Amino acid sequence: MTGESGAAAAPSITLNDEHTMPVLGLGVAELSDDETERAVSAALEIGCRLIDTAYAYGNEAAVGRAIAASGVAREELFVTTKLATPDQGFTRSQEACRASLDRLGLDYVDLYLIHWPAPPVGKYVDAWGGMIQSRGEGHARSIGVSNFTAENIENLIDLTFVTPAVNQIELHPLLNQDELRKANAQHTVVTQSYCPLALGRLLDNPTVTSIASEYVKTPAQVLLRWNLQLGNAVVVRSARPERIASNFDVFDFELAAEHMDALGGLNDGTRVREDPLTYAGT
């Protein structure tokens, strides 16, 4: 990781296509348009530069409005959106990318992801081919996947010879994804975590709260720091400006190995989102 530390000055990580991405960003899943605009505005104001949305969230236009109103230069931003499952396919994925750009009011996205592999649908390889085209046309700087298994990624590489830059997956101490992180790394794919707080389920966990008290940090800050110290990039959602500021204040401390191990030891395979092996939605 490279870059300066600070309350919201997230370091950056270099992707396998040589583009760089902040290691910590704001997610806006399940936020209303008003909540999205307020959250994005608050995040940009404190120095956050990665904003993660998706067609399925229904708030790409709200993200675009907040970006336009912020005055932050486009080249300073890293904007991610995602391809919805009904839009999988070679041609439809390209059309969907252009439609997302229209809603965002942008000429390109920094990262375009296949939201779910949706194995029952059977179109994610075709969709990947279309995304390769979108990248070639300059509509997406980098392309990647979300919720993909190691086998899904190997299928893409074997059939298209193009490796995703990022695999965004559910990852928190209850689901530490050790094997998938190793598989991603073997293919030079950056692991980006979502639901790093397990939808709040870990905020009152005794192990988490005990460690937080030792560092005089919040449980959320400890959970985010754990994820970052594993070498992951992270997207964290919040609609509250004060919580957003707190979530980005995680670059001034480091967890000891014993505390990293204690948090990792909470792993029991619990998912708070759908199972990628069977899910065919979003």
UniProtKB/Swiss-Prot annotation:
Q: Which SUPFAM superfamilies match?
A: NAD(P)-linked oxidoreductase (SSF51430)
How the protein is activated or inhibited is described as: Inhibited by the antituberculosis drug isoniazid (INH).
Q: Name one Pfam family in it.
A: Aldo_ket_red
Q: List the protein's name.
A: Aldo-keto reductase Rv2971
According to its UniProt record, the EC number is 1.1.1.-
Active site residues of this protein = Y57 (proton donor)
Q: How does it assemble?
A: Monomer.
Q: What else is known?
A: Identified as a multidrug-resistant tuberculosis (MDRTB) immunogenic protein.
**Which residues of this UniProt protein bind NADPH?**
L197, L199, V235, R237, S238, A239, R243, S246, N247, R273
- Domain of life from the UniProt record: Bacteria
What taxonomic classification does the UniProt entry list for its organism?
A: Bacteria, Bacillati, Actinomycetota, Actinomycetes, Mycobacteriales
> InterPro entries of this UniProt entry?
AKR (IPR020471), Aldo/ket_reductase_CS (IPR018170), NADP_OxRdtase_dom (IPR023210), NADP_OxRdtase_dom_sf (IPR036812)
The free-text function statement in the UniProt record for this protein reads: Catalyzes the NADPH-dependent reduction of dicarbonyls. Exhibits narrow substrate specificity, with preferential activity against the dicarbonyl substrates methylglyoxal and phenylglyoxal. May play an important role in the detoxification of methylglyoxal.
